[in-house]
């Protein structure tokens, strides 16, 4: 999952459902992810969103909200011992979410929002900034620098080492390719790893924005393929959304992997890592 010259101690795995549907649903997924969470070769984080604030349609399910969502994530943390990732969409959410989450994620659409990046960077959580579908990967260095300078004002330019030390990561999730489609330019992984650790988002990278009459669609045959290519290029970790029953998931089901599919994928990626 990372090449031999990578300085992160272990490959990172971030996995869980797109959005919190219920505590029972979180538990069922968390149980299925235990083999991966217990893999000593991986640095595992359980992920779920308390609010999907950028759904295409007003009618789409968003989640339980900040307070109830964080309570459920804290329950998973307590019961399973998992570290937690969740995303924040507004500045006021950062300090509250950081009481539960070990990683706070900046959504791709908000990757240039200075106030949000600064507020998240003022917490003790790792900052995971998703590259916007509209962004030149090289320009993500400026988002990284916003976070780094918030944490250490003496930093003048971002490097992989300073970003790793200060807990600032980037996440590749594809680039717009005309309307309603995304592609992954594998060159972006190398470009962004010049100034930050890079996580590859296996499931959102195959999304088709707005492709399902008010909802995003995707092709679940591709999430097992692109991460293998990313592992060969060199990455620091994998982000993948997973669900027991993807077809009936309340958000992004078309892109999700079942837990057993994710386990097979990670096994293959670790094998690829050993080739380099």
UniProtKB/Swiss-Prot annotation:
GO cellular component entries: cytoplasm
Q: Where in the cell is it found?
A: Cytoplasm
Predominant cellular place of this UniProt entry's protein: cytoplasm
Q: Which UniProt keywords apply?
A: Cytoplasm, Lipopolysaccharide biosynthesis, Transferase
Spell out the InterPro entries in the cross-references.
Aldolase_TIM, DAHP1/KDSA, KDO8P_synthase
Which catalytic reaction applies to this protein? D-arabinose 5-phosphate + phosphoenolpyruvate + H2O = 3-deoxy-alpha-D-manno-2-octulosonate-8-phosphate + phosphate
Instruction: Kindly indicate whether the keyword Membrane belongs to this entry.
Output: no
* Record GO biological process: keto-3-deoxy-D-manno-octulosonic acid biosynthetic process
Q: What is this protein called?
A: 2-dehydro-3-deoxyphosphooctonate aldolase
Q: Which organism is it from?
A: Helicobacter pylori (strain J99 / ATCC 700824) (Campylobacter pylori J99)
């Amino acid at each position: 999952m990372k090449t031999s010259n990578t300085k992160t101690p272990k490959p990172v795995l971030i996995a869980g459902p797109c959005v919190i549907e219920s505590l029972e649903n979180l538990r069922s997924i968390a149980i299925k992810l235990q083999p991966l969470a217990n893999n000593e070769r991986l640095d595992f984080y359980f992920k779920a969103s308390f609010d999907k604030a950028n759904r295409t349609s007003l009618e789409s399910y968003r989640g339980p909200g900040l307070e109830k969502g964080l309570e459920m994530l804290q329950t998973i943390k307590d019961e399973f011992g998992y570290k937690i990732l969740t995303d924040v969409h507004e500045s006021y959410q950062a300090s509250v979410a950081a009481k539960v989450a070990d990683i706070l994620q900046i959504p791709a659409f908000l990757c240039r929002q200075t106030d949000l990046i600064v507020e998240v960077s003022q917490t003790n959580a790792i900052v995971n900034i998703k590259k916007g579908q509209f962004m030149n990967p090289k320009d993500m260095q400026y988002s990284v620098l916003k976070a780094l300078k918030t944490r250490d004002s003496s930093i003048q330019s971002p490097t992989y080492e300073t970003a790793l030390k200060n807990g600032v990561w980037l996440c590749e999730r594809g680039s717009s390719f005309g309307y309603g489609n995304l592609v992954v330019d594998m060159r972006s992984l190398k470009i962004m790893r010049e100034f930050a650790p890079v996580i590859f988002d296996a499931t959102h990278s195959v999304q088709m924005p707005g492709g399902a009459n008010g909802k995003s669609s995707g092709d679940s045959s591709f999430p097992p393929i692109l991460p293998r290519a990313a592992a060969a290029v060199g990455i620091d970790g994998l982000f993948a959304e997973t669900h027991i029953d993807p077809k009936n998931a309340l958000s992004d089901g078309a892109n999700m992997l079942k837990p057993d599919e994710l386990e097979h994928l990670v096994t293959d990626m670790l094998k690829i890592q050993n080739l380099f």
